[in-house]
Amino acid sequence: MKTSLPIVVLLTAVISGVHPNPTPKSCTVSEEDLTTIRNAIQKASRASLDDVNLDEDLIAKCPLLKTITASLKSVASEIATLKDTGISEEQVDELKQSYEQQVNEIVKSRDIFEKQSGGDVMKEQGAMINRMTELQVQVAQLQQQIGEQTSRMYDDMAELIFQRLAMNSTDSIRNYTAHMMEQKLHTLMTKLETNYRIFLGALRYLDHLGDQPLIDKVFDGILKRLDEMSLETNKERENGKYVLVNLLCWTVNNRFLTEKYRKKQLELFRIALKFYPKTGNKEANEADIRGRQFCDANFPVNVITWFAVSRAAEGWGLRGTL
């Protein structure tokens, strides 16, 4: 017995972890409109923002198409951004080819795009909602997959950059790095914060240099920056959380920072309370922290959610310092 399309959509969403948007009340695109939609999606496989376009009238007929278009634009933007990083053109081209192939597989889906015989209008509308929902799920799965691939590429790039620096660390490189950290610390940290994987990689590279005074200076500089950050804008608040969490990642089992951490513990706790003030929301805080950290350790979560939030707020009288 053939499994009905709504059941397939539901099972696909549950198994993959991709959740379709709430079912819209209507989706009145016609069978002829499907050809236009298919052609637009096929054109989007080029992974160029200029090629991701869908007629506003079609989106008005079926709101799910807005989500689908947004997902395709997100992927195109993600791939375009790779060109401005240190990732090789070959890797970017390979990713684009993979994306194009998978989009072309989606547009070949008979369940979604094959013309169906006419029938009751309400049944046809319900069937079209199911077809567009499946399309949304498939595009969302592809978006998630591309996101995971680009994330791995960034990880590999950051690791390679600092591995090469460590392997080829001459006196001139060490001296130049120390000079930049001494003279341009704020500017350098601000630039590194555009990619937190690279931010953490740069901090770990300092351990390779083994310059204790420089490591102390950078640690203090980051604390000062966190202290000065405003919580009034979402961008600044989000950036501060990423910086705090990955600063703690750098601290994990770091022989250069054992003493520094002891001395700055109360300051760290106060800053943790600044960015995570909802002390009773431990589970949500923990999930948020794990989503930001680029290390496998539990240390950032333990510090922020337990010591800095629970004990500091209740027993160490830090509330009044904020």
UniProtKB/Swiss-Prot annotation:
First and last residue of the signal peptide: 1-20
Disruption phenotype: RNAi-mediated knockdown results in prolonged intradermal probing prior blood engorgement when mosquitoes are fed on human host. No significant effects on probing and feeding time when mosquitoes are fed on membrane-covered heparinized blood.
GO CC field: extracellular region
Main location: secreted
Glycosylation (residues): N168, N175
Disulfide bond positions: C27-C62, C249-C295
UniProt protein name: Labrum-interacting protein from saliva LIPS-2
Species assigned in the record: Aedes albopictus
